[in-house]
Amino acid sequence: MVKQRTLNRVVKASGIGLHSGQKVMINFIPHTVDGGIVFRRIDLDPPVDIPANALLIQEAFMCSNLVTGDIKVGTIEHVMSAIAGLGIDNLIVEVSASEVPIMDGSAGPFIYLLMQGGLCEQDAPKKFIKILKPVEALIDDKKAIFSPHNGFQLNFTIDFDHPAFAKEYQSATIDFSTETFVYEVSEARTFGFMKDLDYLKANNLALGASLDNAIGVDDTGVVNEEGLRFADEFVRHKILDAVGDLYLLGHQIIAKFDGYKSGHALNNQLLRNVQSDPSNYEIVTFNDEKDCPIPYVSVT
């Protein structure tokens, strides 16, 4: 049987909030069977739990934010992506502020931290969401589409007319597994244009942004001295974001995802469109690991 997963032990770390610029503590706590992914604001008294649920995404400008009432946990997509990449079903993510720390702008540091906690199988079947028919979300010329597929394949295309974005590196395809995610996706960093930074900071956004946690792009190219980690790092990061955004459906998805210029808001709309019609999907489990179309890292 393919079983649910959590961590063996608590892992604690800290980092800088991308938008607040403040130090943020983050703790990963093992969670119970069918508990799902839950974000907990421990800076509040009493602490407030917000489940990682697509229907609780109320803001999606530049990042995915979970909101319940007037309580928010922002910039969750990179840690959600790491959680999805390792096949973790149940986890409490404690944060000491209204956003998850940005770390180096990728999911790599979160993969490292979660692996320090050790993966632990739980005595319950892992649930998957199998897409049964095409579902799409469209905004202007942007597209996000699910279609039936025996696995989880992500195809993404960006479209930037800019010297830093070579045409041959604006599309990528990943057949999702723990191995492909960790080695081909997780280290891809977020990126932004230097010309936008002053505007963002004037609006109390990106106060923690630096070349240590993002790829900076000016009018001619990449500003970071070390350059890119991959020739197609920009589109790989969009796939990283999509993996995290789509895991907000509550379980690993079995489908093909096609994204064209899609972002957090459109990814979220796609999930809402899936949920709007129960005939779009079914919940499946696998009694035999050989039947599972998505390869995960072994739990030892």
Swiss-Prot record:
Keywords: Hydrolase, Lipid A biosynthesis, Lipid biosynthesis, Lipid metabolism, Metal-binding, Zinc. This is UDP-3-O-acyl-N-acetylglucosamine deacetylase. HAMAP family: LpxC. Catalyzes the hydrolysis of UDP-3-O-myristoyl-N-acetylglucosamine to form UDP-3-O-myristoylglucosamine and acetate, the committed step in lipid A biosynthesis. Zn(2+) binds at H78, H237, D241. Pathway: Glycolipid biosynthesis; lipid IV(A) biosynthesis; lipid IV(A) from (3R)-3-hydroxytetradecanoyl-[acyl-carrier-protein] and UDP-N-acetyl-alpha-D-glucosamine: step 2/6. It comes from Acinetobacter baumannii (strain ATCC 17978 / DSM 105126 / CIP 53.77 / LMG 1025 / NCDC KC755 / 5377). The active site is at H264 (proton donor). GO terms for cellular component: membrane. It catalyses: a UDP-3-O-[(3R)-3-hydroxyacyl]-N-acetyl-alpha-D-glucosamine + H2O = a UDP-3-O-[(3R)-3-hydroxyacyl]-alpha-D-glucosamine + acetate. It is an enzyme of class 3 (hydrolase). GO terms for molecular function: metal ion binding; UDP-3-O-acyl-N-acetylglucosamine deacetylase activity. GO terms for biological process: lipid A biosynthetic process. Belongs to the LpxC family.
